[in-house]
Amino acid sequence: MVNNVTDSSFKNEVLESDLPVMVDFWAEWCGPCKMLIPIIDEISKELQDKVKVLKMNIDENPKTPSEYGIRSIPTIMLFKNGEQKDTKIGLQQKNSLLDWINKSI
């Protein structure tokens, strides 16, 4: 299961993480976001020792998405050593996400 991150826990969970972090920015009303859930869950299990995978509900946590300029969801961001490394927007296939993550970290 993928853990949630909030505006208040973002710095500690993401920016100060020893592992690279993938954050899935989503909303309850977003159809493509719901389609991405099982893919994100599988990636989290497969990469559990290499990458921390988190989800952020943008309706419940508007500050962080605004700071990172998120205008469309789902948006997936990769962070490493406290810095944003790369971004993917829209529904993604598992294999393309895995390739992207492995190249980015």
Swiss-Prot record:
One of its GO terms (cellular component) is cytoplasm. GO terms for molecular function: protein-disulfide reductase activity. Residues 1-105 form the Thioredoxin domain. Disulfide bonds join 30-33. CDD domains: TRX_family (cd02947). The keyword Heme does not apply. Keywords: Disulfide bond, Electron transport, Redox-active center, Transport. PANTHER family: GEO12009P1 (PTHR45663:SF11). Component of the thioredoxin-thioredoxin reductase system. Participates in various redox reactions through the reversible oxidation of its active center dithiol to a disulfide and catalyzes dithiol-disulfide exchange reactions. This is Thioredoxin. It comes from Rickettsia prowazekii (strain Madrid E).
